[in-house]
């Protein structure tokens, strides 16, 4: 009888992938990234282990959304204080902090537990085309 082998933390190989967000649709891009962060593209995928890879996203300010979402999509955050709810539209958040748009989209597609938080730490998002991870030799992710 065959036994399923659970990979140990030492045997998990982590690769670095580079994604250019220029002219990509936000949701389609986020699903690709979340899949790689979880490790679902690997034959050693295990749901309860962090088997995923690192993902570097560049040109975050050039990501696109379809329809009227640029003027209608709202991003909410709360300071934790009474009356501390802040609401911001997609276009103003894209001018101010474009990294947060991709981060929130991907974070919502990861597990909502400690494993998801651990996988989310492997996502690196940058506003422009420059990133400080050249030493890791990232491979372009075909998406």
UniProtKB/Swiss-Prot annotation:
Protein name in UniProt: Large ribosomal subunit protein uL13
Superkingdom of origin: Bacteria
Gene Ontology MF term list: mRNA binding; structural constituent of ribosome
Record-level GO BP terms: negative regulation of translation; translation
Disulfide cysteine pairs (residue numbers): none
CDD domains, sorted: Ribosomal_L13
PROSITE patterns: RIBOSOMAL_L13 (PS00783)
Keywords: Ribonucleoprotein, Ribosomal protein
Keyword Ribonucleoprotein: yes
Listed InterPro entries: Ribosomal_uL13 (IPR005822), Ribosomal_uL13_bac-type (IPR005823), Ribosomal_uL13_CS (IPR023563), Ribosomal_uL13_sf (IPR036899)
SUPFAM superfamilies: Ribosomal protein L13
Family: Belongs to the universal ribosomal protein uL13 family.
Record text on subunit structure and interactions: Part of the 50S ribosomal subunit.
Any GO CC annotation of this UniProt entry: cytosolic large ribosomal subunit
Annotated function: This protein is one of the early assembly proteins of the 50S ribosomal subunit, although it is not seen to bind rRNA by itself. It is important during the early stages of 50S assembly.
